[in-house]
Swiss-Prot record:
Lipid bilayer topology: Multi-pass membrane protein
Localization per Swiss-Prot or TrEMBL: Cell membrane
Entry protein name: UPF0391 membrane protein Bxeno_A1464
Record-stated family: Belongs to the UPF0391 family.
Organism: Paraburkholderia xenovorans (strain LB400)
Keywords, in A-Z order: Cell membrane, Membrane, Transmembrane, Transmembrane helix
Lineage, opening ranks: Bacteria, Pseudomonadati, Pseudomonadota, Betaproteobacteria, Burkholderiales
Keyword Cell membrane: yes
Annotated TM spans: 5-25, 30-50
InterPro entries on file: DUF1328
Major localization class: membrane
Short name of any one Pfam family annotated for the protein: DUF1328
Amino acid sequence: MLRYAAIFFIIAIIAAVFGFGGIAAGATEIAKVLFFIFVVIFLVTLLMGVMRR
């Protein structure tokens, strides 16, 4: 359990460095683009699955 706490602490420190630095603004733009790409991929695979039946 202490191992998981240490891992989450390290992840929180890394997230804080990115959040309080200037990297977060660029990362949000990349995340928005990736979100829409994966939504399109999801819809295409969903339609292919429906058509297959």
